[in-house]
Amino acid sequence: HDPVTATRAFVVTADVGEPMDIELRGLEDLDPAIAQAFTDAAARWESVIVRGLPDYVPSSPRPSCLPEDVDPLPAVVDDVIVDVATPVIDGPGEVLGQAGPTCVLSTTELGIHGIIEIDLADAAQMLANGSLGEVIEHELGHVLGIGTLWDTSWMQQGQRRLLQGSGTSNPTYRGAAGVAEWSAFGRSGN
């Protein structure tokens, strides 16, 4: 008898848990091209951050950290809510955008709400030269904690101290996991 062989192809995937969800509010008030740039930037971050955070149930829809001029929080926050707007910040040039977390959980030291403002006076030029998406990705990084939550000593129970030399001409990021990933990509420096 001839031997019998069989081949079967299959794909194995790892369960990374719940995905990262970035909810953008205020898109309907923006120029459609600008709104799309925000949507694309959020999708990019959601593809980079592969695991979401536990859902958060706020004790109040309007915690004291939430700015008065934004909508209340929903009954459940999954994972971060970002209110977006395009006010005139300083006119053409200079400040293109500004952003950061407004509500930070003491348990994770991560934001559940933040704000991004892109200077309306610069938005058309950034759309024309193709830089708007990168600027929004940069600002969204601040809402997610990059550069803004590296040191949480200002919080009552804040434990994170990832930035050495803050406020100097040579600040150094020293988070072990971040430095390891940076090195894994073949990068060097701080």
Model-predicted regions and their roles:
Residues 1-2, 190:
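Accessible peptide chain termini
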